[in-house]
């Protein structure tokens, strides 16, 4: 299935691989000649006949149709290890979904005894400046807050000043990238602080270009979620700090949680930038059924349309994995139709 979803499906949906720097999703004769010589990733689309092994695959492929903008999806059943992906190996803008990795990098320092959850640091508040006027956007120090609160608001409220506060403490983007590499996750890169990322947003259209700065693949983000959830990367206490913050997320109510049944718990982190919306998280159902999902949507005409696409894909992923695992939905009884009368 992964071979089809990672290759055949990409072509079947009309998607094209991109090179490392921001480039249009097109090729010309010069690029084709260069590609032939040096084996780069930019290639003319090949023709494939879409073959689906299951109706689950077909449904996700239909929902992730990229005709109006690239859509990347990756998900894994955390109980069985079964995976599904569409453009799962292609880079998408991280936006604020990177904040989970920033929190994890800080919590490692807590476990090493260098800091604690009560250590206080100042918020880093952006100072108005023109786009691209400096390598890094200027910031000023704001109120001091304990690290535990910084982590909670950077995830649950997507606070940029809180994120940049901890990003500076851990050693900047390079330190977060290093933490990810040490966990075995390669297709992830933070290159700027959030203040700079937001100030300079809009340089490229993510629906037609790939900017390798501040980007990751959906598969990489699912690997991050899986490792955190299963306790592979951090201690049980640190793991719970992140999951609790994700469970309190206030942003993205129209994304992953929007179409979920009331009996599931969603722990997630959203991301939004120019012409792109994303949501990554853990969906826990009854009987311990849990999946990790990463959904990155570009284009589609408007933010509301992107959010609706995320919601429908997330529900289809949950239902598809639950059905394959034989997880029954809890029966909800009305006041006039309960067992025994």
Describe the residue ranges of each PLM region:
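Bacterial N-terminal signal peptides
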Residues: 10-20
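A short, well-structured edge-of-sheet supersecondary motif
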Residues: 55-88, 283
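Acidic helix-start/capping segments at beta-turn-to-alpha-helix junctions
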Residues: 78-79, 117-135, 170-171, 194-198, ...
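Active-site SXXK
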Residues: 81, 93-123, 293
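Bacterial N-terminal signal peptides that target proteins for export
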Residues: 1-11
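Structured C-terminal helix/loop/strand segments within mature extracytoplasmic catalytic/sensor domains
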Residues: 26-59, 63, 168-169, 173, ...
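Active-site-proximal loop and beta-strand segments within enzyme catalytic domains
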Residues: 108-153
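Mid-domain, small-residue-enriched loop/turn segments at the edges of structured enzyme/sensor domains
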Residues: 70, 143, 151, 164-225
């Amino acid at each position: 299935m992964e071979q089809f979803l990672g290759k055949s499906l990409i072509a079947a949906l009309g998607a094209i691989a991109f090179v490392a720097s921001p480039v249009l999703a097109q090729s010309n004769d010069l690029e084709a000649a260069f590609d032939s010589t040096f084996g780069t990733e930019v290639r003319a689309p090949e023709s494939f006949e879409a073959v689906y092994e299951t109706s689950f695959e077909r449904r996700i492929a239909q929902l992730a149709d990229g005709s109006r903008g690239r859509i990347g999806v990756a998900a894994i059943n955390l109980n069985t290890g079964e995976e599904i992906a569409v453009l799962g190996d292609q880079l998408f803008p991280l936006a604020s979904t990177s904040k989970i990795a920033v929190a994890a990098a800080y919590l490692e320092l807590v476990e090493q005894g260098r800091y604690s959850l009560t250590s206080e640091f100042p918020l880093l508040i952006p100072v108005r400046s023109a786009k691209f006027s400096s390598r890094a956007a200027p910031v000023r120090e704001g109120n001091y807050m304990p690290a535990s609160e910084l982590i909670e608001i950077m995830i649950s409220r997507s606070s940029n000043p809180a994120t940049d506060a901890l990003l500076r403490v851990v050693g900047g983007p390079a330190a977060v990238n290093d933490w990810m590499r040490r966990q075995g996750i390669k297709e992830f890169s933070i290159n700027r602080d959030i203040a700079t990322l937001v100030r300079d947003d809009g340089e490229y259209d993510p629906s037609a270009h790939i900017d390798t700065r501040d980007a990751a693949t959906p598969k990489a983000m699912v690997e991050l979620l899986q490792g955190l959830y299963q306790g592979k990367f951090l201690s049980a206490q640190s793991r719970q700090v992140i999951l609790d913050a994700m469970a309190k997320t206030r942003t993205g109510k129209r994304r992953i949680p929007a179409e979920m049944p009331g009996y599931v718990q969603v722990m997630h982190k959203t991301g939004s930038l120019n012409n792109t919306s994303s949501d990554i998280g853990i969906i826990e159902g009854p009987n311990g059924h849990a999946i990790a999902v990463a959904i990155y949507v570009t284009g589609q005409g408007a933010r509301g349309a992107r959010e609706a696409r995320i919601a429908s894909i997330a529900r289809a992923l949950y239902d598809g994995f639950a059905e394959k695992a034989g997880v029954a939905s809890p029966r909800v009884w009305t006041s006039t139709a309960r067992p025994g009368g």
